[in-house]
Amino acid sequence: MPEPIRSDNLSSPSGPSASDEEDSPADYIVDINCNVPAWQKWASPLEAWVQASMQALRMPPGEISLYLTDDADCAVYNERFRGRTGPTNVLSFPVPRPDGDALHGPRLWGDILLSYETITREAAEQGKDFEAHLVHLLVHGLLHLQGFDHENDAEAAIMESHEISALAQLGFANPYRLDEEHA
């Protein structure tokens, strides 16, 4: 299992200090597979958001695949891999990493699947900007690729704190505060 990031490894909401060594966006490779026309206009912005999110989370350089799809396709993956009926907003499929540091080259992090219809519907229902909700789900998916989960309250609190910190670095508000306002 990949070693998760730690809160002391995240930069502060104001960004990294000048002494921190930064990976450049070129160190993060994003392969985008888009089978839904509604996603087309988001392909380039998504690539940039994924790279910026990986930097904000201080992920080591590597590659991810982003699969932009719809509810029908997402429901198939959700049933097959999670045993849950119906679509969801984001699914993450981490690539297992062999023990040791003997691997060379960029790390293969895994795949993230995003469902346009569910994300659009959730953003409208929760009174959120589509792009803000989308970037939140990207960060959420990237944390799953690093081994984070939210199966219980303690895990969820840790994951949410990383999401809030990364989103603040990217210029987005705390998405959970917005959820509380619309509850």
Give residue ranges: language-model regions.
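Short active-site segment of divalent metal-dependent hydrolases/proteases
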Residues: V139, L143-H144
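An acidic/histidine-cluster motif and surrounding catalytic segment
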Residues: M1-L134, Q146-A183
